């Protein structure tokens, strides 16, 4: 069996194994992948989605910064992607038969000083994943630096329920929505106080949603629609004595 045929066979096996593991049904798309954040992934904490400490939020080190073409101004925050290294294009740099699922937690910004095929990997319209090093090394050989990949969105699995962190000041509420399963990302969100109806929030940045309702002293409820189209209400999540900076966990979770 020649090298080309071996590479194609390895890729087929990796894709089959990945689909079986991730329950994926969508088509595969080509992209490229690099890594950042150090061997322990600590440099990936924070990021343009606003998740902060990814260990505390339940996302861990299997995460990635998305190129501008994939990030969608923060609407992709929390989405999960199944990624395999394309052995048909770089057999010497791929770990055959492997796959990894990563969560979108950051933006890989464009680098206009470099060409898209010569260092400006995240320049539009390129689909690119700048993965945590531990995640990337599950599919690629360290010395490569960059590898061709195939990817698709898959369902996110999370432990526990959806969480809401309420920041802000006075009449301004900034709500970070985390630990979202199913499609992983939020399409729209609402907030409600004890004495109000549902008030639609707008995306401030990343996974942070804002309201100018001034709801201090009222118990807070939330409603969320995921990008998969599932709508859930989370009643009386925060008691009337809530304080800015607190995080509130729920027992509800999304399926899609």
Curated annotation (Swiss-Prot):
State its location(s): Secreted, Cell wall; Membrane
How is this protein situated with respect to the membrane?
Answer: Peripheral membrane protein
Major location (coarse): secreted
One Gene Ontology cellular component term attached to this UniProt record is: membrane
Q: Does the keyword Cell wall biogenesis/degradation apply?
A: yes
List, for all copies, the residue spans of the domain called Expansin-like EG45.
Answer: 46-161
InterPro entries listed in its UniProt record: Expan_Lol_pI, Expansin, Expansin/allergen_DPBB_dom, Expansin_CBD, Expansin_CBD_sf, RlpA-like_DPBB, RlpA-like_sf
Q: Which PROSITE patterns match?
A: EXPANSIN_CBD (PS50843), EXPANSIN_EG45 (PS50842)
Name the keywords, alphabetized: Cell wall, Cell wall biogenesis/degradation, Membrane, Secreted, Signal
The residues covered by the Expansin-like CBD domain are 171-250
Q: What does this protein do?
A: May cause loosening and extension of plant cell walls by disrupting non-covalent bonding between cellulose microfibrils and matrix glucans. No enzymatic activity has been found. May be required for rapid internodal elongation in deepwater rice during submergence.
Indicate the family of this protein.
Belongs to the expansin family. Expansin A subfamily.
Q: This chain belongs to which protein, by name?
A: Expansin-A31
Q: Which organism is it from?
A: Oryza sativa subsp. japonica (Rice)
**Gene that produces this protein:** EXPA31
């Amino acid at each position: 069996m020649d090298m080309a045929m071996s590479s194609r066979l390895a890729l087929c096996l990796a894709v089959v194994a990945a689909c079986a593991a991730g329950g994926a049904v969508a088509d595969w798309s080509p992209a490229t992948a690099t890594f950042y954040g150090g061997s322990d992934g600590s440099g990936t904490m924070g990021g343009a989605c606003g998740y902060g400490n990814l260990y505390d939020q339940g996302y861990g080190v299997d995460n990635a910064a998305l190129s501008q073409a994939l990030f969608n101004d923060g609407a992709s925050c929390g989405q999960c992607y199944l990624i395999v290294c394309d052995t048909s294009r770089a057999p010497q740099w791929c770990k055959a038969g492997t796959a990894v699922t990563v969560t979108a937690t950051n933006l890989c910004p464009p680098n206009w000083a470099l060409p898209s095929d010569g260092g400006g990997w995240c320049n539009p319209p390129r689909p690119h994943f700048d993965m945590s090093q531990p995640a990337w090394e599950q599919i690629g050989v360290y010395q490569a630096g960059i590898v061709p990949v195939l990817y698709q969105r898959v369902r996110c699995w999370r432990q526990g329920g959806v969480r809401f962190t309420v920041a802000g000041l006075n009449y301004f509420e900034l709500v970070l929505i985390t630990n979202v399963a199913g499609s992983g990302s939020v399409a729209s969100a609402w907030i409600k106080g004890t004495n109000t109806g549902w008030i639609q929030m707008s995306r401030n940045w990343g996974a942070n949603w804002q309201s100018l309702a001034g709801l201090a002293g009222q118990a807070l409820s939330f409603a969320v629609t995921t990008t998969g189209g599932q709508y859930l209400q989370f009643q009386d999540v925060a008691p009337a004595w809530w304080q800015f900076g607190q995080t509130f966990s729920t027992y509800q979770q999304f399926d899609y």
